[in-house]
UniProtKB/Swiss-Prot annotation:
This is Presequence protease, mitochondrial. It comes from Homo sapiens (Human). Changing R183 to D/E: Loss of metalloendopeptidase activity towards an amyloid-beta peptide derivative. Changing C119S: No loss of metalloendopeptidase activity under oxidizing conditions. Changing R183Q: In SCAR30; decreased function in degradation of amyloid-beta protein 40; decreased metalloendopeptidase activity towards different substrates including an amyloid-beta peptide derivative; decreased protein levels in patient tissues; no effect on mitochondrial localization.
Amino acid sequence: MWRCGGRQGLCVLRRLSGGHAHHRAWRWNSNRACERALQYKLGDKIHGFTVNQVTSVPELFLTAVKLTHDDTGARYLHLAREDTNNLFSVQFRTTPMDSTGVPHILEHTVLCGSQKYPCRDPFFKMLNRSLSTFMNAFTASDYTLYPFSTQNPKDFQNLLSVYLDATFFPCLRELDFWQEGWRLEHENPSDPQTPLVFKGVVFNEMKGAFTDNERIFSQHLQNRLLPDHTYSVVSGGDPLCIPELTWEQLKQFHATHYHPSNARFFTYGNFPLEQHLKQIHEEALSKFQKIEPSTVVPAQTPWDKPREFQITCGPDSFATDPSKQTTISVSFLLPDITDTFEAFTLSLLSSLLTSGPNSPFYKALIESGLGTDFSPDVGYNGYTREAYFSVGLQGIAEKDIETVRSLIDRTIDEVVEKGFEDDRIEALLHKIEIQMKHQSTSFGLMLTSYIASCWNHDGDPVELLKLGNQLAKFRQCLQENPKFLQEKVKQYFKNNQHKLTLSMRPDDKYHEKQAQVEATKLKQKVEALSPGDRQQIYEKGLELRSQQSKPQDASCLPALKVSDIEPTIPVTELDVVLTAGDIPVQYCAQPTNGMVYFRAFSSLNTLPEELRPYVPLFCSVLTKLGCGLLDYREQAQQIELKTGGMSASPHVLPDDSHMDTYEQGVLFSSLCLDRNLPDMMQLWSEIFNNPCFEEEEHFKVLVKMTAQELANGIPDSGHLYASIRAGRTLTPAGDLQETFSGMDQVRLMKRIAEMTDIKPILRKLPRIKKHLLNGDNMRCSVNATPQQMPQTEKAVEDFLRSIGRSKKERRPVRPHTVEKPVPSSSGGDAHVPHGSQVIRKLVMEPTFKPWQMKTHFLMPFPVNYVGECIRTVPYTDPDHASLKILARLMTAKFLHTEIREKGGAYGGGAKLSHNGIFTLYSYRDPNTIETLQSFGKAVDWAKSGKFTQQDIDEAKLSVFSTVDAPVAPSDKGMDHFLYGLSDEMKQAHREQLFAVSHDKLLAVSDRYLGTGKSTHGLAILGPENPKIAKDPSWIIQ
C-alpha cells in the first residue's frame, strides 16, 4: 500500500488518537508488562542485542526499551504496555531517486514468496491462517514499513517468521515482478492476436491513486518544495514511469536497502521481549554482518528566494461551480523533524493557525467565501526529513489566486502582531490530554506510525513519546516569553525564503492527455520488440496465467488451528436504567482511564419523508452553528475546552431477524475528561433545546466544505459507493442507506452548494429538530469507570430532564412500526431490572419486493469500482454464518486470483454485511464486464464445492479474526446498544460459525447465490464503457 507522504500530514493531536476501532482485553489495573521491562539494565546482553536505554513513559502507560543488534547494528525499540493487542513492525529507509515506484513494487513483491516459505503469495495466505488483528505493508516517501498485530502468542511467532523471511530472504521471482509491478501482455493472454497492453497491480493502483486531484496536488507540493533528493520523485510510482523499471533494478534495490543495518525493529504490547529478540536474531539477523547503508537523506538546500509553480489536474465532475476548480497553497520549509521539541511546538502552532472556526486562517480563508475548503495538506506535515507547513484554498476561481495569496500574507502579519488567545492554547493542550488518556485498540499501530519518520532520520523515538515533558517545556516557554509563538510565526513564515506557491487548475483534457502519453509509451515499447520478444511475451503471459490458475500448496506456511480460537466470548456486564421517566440509559463500567463516553440514539420514525435526505446535512452542522447564548465561534471554543468532540451521524440499523425491518435514527456521540462531564452535558442540553439555525453565512461555508469533502472522497471510497447503490433496491433499508450515504447524497450536497439562495434549506433544519432533538424515542449509553458512575448518572439524568418532550405523541410516518425489546446482554435479568430494557422502534415494510437495478456512474477516472449485491438472510438465521464463511472462502480461494492477480485490480473480494447483503466488489479495477463475469464464475466455483476442509478452516480463522477484533473500553456494549445484540445472541452466532461445514456451504451457495435464486443489484463507478452504453438494462448517470 502506498502512502503519499503529504496525505499523512496529521499533527501530534490526531496521530496519537487512533480512531474508533475495536478492542478486547484491557487490564489497566495491572502494569505487569511495564514493570517487567523496567528490570532491564543498560548494557544487558540478550540474544545478540545490547540494551541501550530503559525509560518509563507514564503518560502513555508504557516502558520503552531501546536496543542495538551487536553484529549488524540493527536498531530495536520495544514498548512494553499491558495491552494484549501486540504489534511487530520492521522498517527500512528506502530512498528512490526516480519515479519508477521501485520501493512500492518491492513492497508488493517481497510478500509473494520467500526462501523458507516459497509458496506464492504467503502474505495473503497468512490472512487466512492467522487470528491477526492487522496485517499490511506501507511505502512512504522515504521508508517502507511492514506491521502486523495479534492477540495470540503462537500467532505472533508464526507471523513474525513469515515477515522476517519475506523482508530479508524474498524469492523476488520475475513472474511476481510482472504480476505486481508491470508487464506487457496481450489483452487476452491466450490470444496473441489481441493488442499488447500494460498490466500490473501497482501500475493500476497508481493510475487509480492519481485520479484523486488532492493526491496530485500533495505529490507535486512535496516534489517541488523538496527538489534536491528523494522527495523530488514519486515513491509509489508514476504510472508513466513505472514501465521503465527492470527486474534487475528491483533486486538491486532490495540488496542495498533491505539489510539489518538499514532496518528498525519495533515491538509493542505485553508479550515478553526476550522471545521476540531470540526469534529475530536466530531467523534473520544472525545471517548478516554490519554494512554502512548509503540511504541517508541529506538536508534540503534552503532557497534564497520564494518559488512558484502551476500544475494541471482532471476536472471535478462534482464541483459546485465549474468556474471555481482552482487550488492554491503557500508552503514553507520547516526544521528537521529530529528536533522533537521544535517539531512538537510547530505541530501545535499549526493547529492554532488552521484548526476550527476560531483559527486565523479559517477566518481569513474559509470565511472569505472565495473557495470551498482548505487546500490539501493544510497544516504541519512532519513525514519528510524537514517538515513543512502548507495553507491555501481549493475550489476558487483562477482570478482569485492573488487575493488568496495576499490574505495568507496578511494573516501571518496579524498573528505576528496579535498572537493567540489564552483560551485557544488551553483548548489545544486539553485536546492532547484527552488523546493521551483515550484508549484505542490499535495503539501499537498508531505508535509505530507516529515514530516512523523521526526514527527513520535517526531521531530519538523515545523522546518523541515523552509528551508530558514536551507539554511542560511548552508551557514554560510561553510563561517565560508571552511572544514565544509569535516569534516562531515570524521566523518560519514571515521571514522564510524557502516558500512555495503552488496552484493547480483543471484541464478538461487532462485524463485524455495522460492516456495519450501512456499510449505513446506503449507504442514505443511495442515497436521496439523483435518477433522473438513478442513470442517470449506471449509465452510469459501464458506461464503467468498458468501459475495463477494452479492450486497452491501452502503447507509450508505456519497456521493456527480452529481449536486455537476461543470457544466463548467474554461477557460484557451492562446496566440499563430508566431515567427521567421512561428513557433507557445503558451503563457499561469499563477501565476508561478517567474518560466518560456518552452517546444518545434518537429515532427518525416521525420525520416527514421529504426531510429525510437532509438529515446528514443536519447532523454535519448541528454542533457547528452555535447554541443557546453561544455563537458558532464560542460554541467551537467550549467544545474544544470541555470535550474530546461532539458529533451527530445518521444510522440505518438492520434488524437481526427480518430483512425488511430496520431502525432509522441519529447517533449523538461525545467524550470528555470526567471533571468536565457536567459542562459537556450542559452543552448537549443547549444543542438539544436551543440550537442556532440563523447563521446563514456560516451555514453556506459548512455546506461548501461538506460537498467538497464528499466529492474528494470518491476516489478512495468508490467501491463503497458502488456497493451502496447496488444494494439500494434489495431491502427497504438499502434505499435509505443510499439517501444518507450513497451517490444520491453526494449529488444532493452538490446541488445545495450550488444554490444562490440557501435559505430554503436552512429553514428545513428547525423542522428536523422538532422530530429529533427531544426525549421521545430516545435511548442513551455511557461508558465510564465504576468510580465515575454515580456522578455520571446524575449528569445524564439532569440532561434528560432538561430536554423537551412532545406534548402529544407524534405518529410514525411509515404505517408499519414494531416495538422490539432488546434482550439483556449478560444472561437473564441480573443486570437489567424488569421493565428497564431498551425498546427499539423498528420500521417494517411487509409488502416490500426487491428488484434488480444496474447503475453506471460516469466518472473521469481511468479505473473502475464495481459492486454486485445479493439479498440473503439476517444475522440470526443459521445460514448467515455459512454465508459469512463462504464470502471469505470465495475471496481467498477464487476472487483474489481472478480480480487482482489476473485482472490487475488493486483489490476485490466478497463480504457479507450484518444486514444480510452479500457483496462482490472490486477496487481500482481496469475491467468492468470481465469483473462481473468473474463474480459469476466465483459463484459457480462455490457451487462446485472445489474446496477442502483446510480451506474452510482457514476461512473460519479469517472470519474469527474479525469477529474477535479487540474492542476498546469506550466501545464495549455498543453492539447491544445499537443493534440489540446480546452476548447470548453473539455466542449463538459464534457456535453457528464453528458449525459451518462443506455441506452447509454448498447449500447456501446454491440457495442464495445462484442465478434466479435471489435478487441482485449492480453498480459501477468509472469511465465510459461502450458495451454498457449499448445495454438498455443499465441506467447511466
